[in-house]
Amino acid sequence: MNKQFKSKSELFYYLMHGYMYMLEDVPTKNGIQKRLKDNELEQSLKEQIKEQLKIDGLEVELKLGPAYNRTESPWIQLFTPENRSGAKGRYVGISFERDKNEVKLWIGFGRTAKKQSEVLELAKDYRMKYSFIEAELDKGFKYNEDCYDSLIIEKEINIKDFSDAEFEEDLIYITNLYKEFETQYGTAIFKTFSSNEITYEEINERMLQIIEEVGELARAIKELGKK
């Protein structure tokens, strides 16, 4: 069976309300997993997702939960080739809130194989770097303030208000933000005056130390003023 989707809104509505009900337990090399038994439909769906969400420089994959909100539902991941399938834990996601009838477009990062304290520091680090790129988020995107142990920049769109043209603009905006982050901080290395190589992570660590030292100095000056 083959199913053709004329628009992103039609595709997303199917993923939100139809796809989950057609999944069955299928044996794979990784054990029993939820899949469409209709392989032709599965492949057609994946190809149409790639076509509908084509962004220069990014690859696209259909995933099946959990997404950042830990729901067992289909979602879509966009990522740079160097960050294959979110291997570095950074990607753009499109997920679906069936109960709210909403599409969510977001930037996030994975939290696997890291201690909570490490993730908290990473979240602060990422937020600072994104603020350097875009001090004020545009097009209705916002930071999810409820995610204390991750960084999520997101926008919620109700399917009844969905516009393919507006979503295309939103997608370009958020993926450009993601690509700029990957370009600046993902793989870049700086040359210092001493000809030693230093990564952005090392620069950021030093910046955080300086910020802490400045804060301590400011507190000390304030205390002196009270005497």
For every predicted segment, state its role.
Residues 33, 97-149:
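Compact, glycine/acidic-enriched structural inserts
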Residues 32-39, 161, 197, 201-204, ...:
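Charge-dense, low-complexity intrinsically disordered segments
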Residues 189-227:
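Flexible "arm" and connector segments at domain edges
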Residues 2-26, 30, 38, 144-191:
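Long, solvent-exposed, polar/charged low-complexity segments
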Residues 37-47, 119-130, 170-171:
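Well-ordered, non-membrane alpha-helical segments in soluble/globular domains
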Residues 69-118:
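Aromatic- and glycine-enriched beta-alpha-beta binding-site module
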Residues 3-74:
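Charge-rich, low-complexity N-terminal segments
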